[in-house]
């Protein structure tokens, strides 16, 4: 959403340059093109949204509005990500994402587990 900006790029395989180029491809579509977001982290003063437009993003996105070049975006994204805490669900998310969305195989008791190291964090 325009008021929240773009996704962080400090996860495994993340790349601010790749994200910027991908976003710019989307923002080259006609202004009235509807964009449906996979999730939203709204500020407390607004409800969750799932839809925006190319026009709205190009005019109002705090990270990638028109006039922001790749170098400026990469610097902003890298500096911002450096200061963010690790997300609460990063360890289970990585375990599922690395398996292309599939859960780990079930163990002997028939249950699949996402395992979290307790002495590493």
Where are these regions (language model features)?
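His/Asp/Glu-rich metal-coordinating catalytic cores
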Residues: 1-20, 24, 53-57
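Generic detector of bulky aromatic hydrophobic side chains
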Residues: 3-10, 36, 40-44
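Accessory terminal helices/loops
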Residues: 21-34, 40-121
């Amino acid at each position: 959403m325009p008021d929240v900006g773009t996704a962080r790029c400090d996860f495994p395989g993340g790349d601010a340059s790749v994200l910027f180029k991908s976003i710019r491809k989307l923002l080259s579509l006609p202004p009235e093109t509807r964009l449906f977001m996979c999730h939203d982290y709204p500020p407390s003063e607004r409800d969750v949204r799932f839809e925006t437009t190319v026009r709205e993003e190009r005019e109002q996105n705090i990270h990638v509005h028109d006039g922001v070049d790749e170098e400026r975006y990469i610097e902003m994204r890298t500096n911002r990500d450096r200061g963010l805490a690790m997300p609460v669900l990063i360890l289970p998310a990585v375990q599922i994402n690395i398996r292309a969305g599939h859960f780990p195989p079930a163990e002997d008791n028939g249950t699949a587990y996402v395992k979290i190291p307790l002495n590493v964090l």
